[in-house]
Amino acid sequence: MKLLKVAAFAAIVVSGSALAGVVPQWGGGGNHNGGGNSSGPDSTLSIYQYGSANAALALQSDARKSETTITQSGYGNGADVGQGADNSTIELTQNGFRNNATIDQWNAKNSDITVGQYGGNNAALVNQTASDSSVMVRQVGFGNNATANQY
């Protein structure tokens, strides 16, 4: 019986750790806006998915000291996120089912985007290119749609 408990616990630990991951990124060193040399982007891109049939596509390119975090819980959630902005963050949280988000932040230095969708069949489209800016979208319930553009 003890062996069965240990095996069950090990299966939970292994399956739980397979659900989370950090995605490696590449960005050039060299000079960047006269700021001197950099050995890398010094940024993080993390995707955490819990449940089933969730999908995430993320690109973080030439985004120094930036952070992108996608967390999806439930079933059938989708995310398409792109960032190419220095000192900026994107945080996407989707809980429920069939929520979809498309988020793009390019050339928007020192900017933040936060999107939270809770429920089902919600959709968000966010585009930001304005520096020193922030966008926040929060949707709770079912069948909500939001579009936010900040240039």
UniProtKB/Swiss-Prot annotation:
Keywords: Fimbrium, Signal. GO terms for cellular component: pilus. Its main location: other. The keyword Signal applies. NCBIfam families: PRK10051.1. Curlin is the structural subunit of the curli. Curli are coiled surface structures that assemble preferentially at growth temperatures below 37 degrees Celsius. Curli can bind to fibronectin. This is Major curlin subunit. It comes from Salmonella enteritidis. The lineage of its organism: Bacteria, Pseudomonadati, Pseudomonadota, Gammaproteobacteria, Enterobacterales.
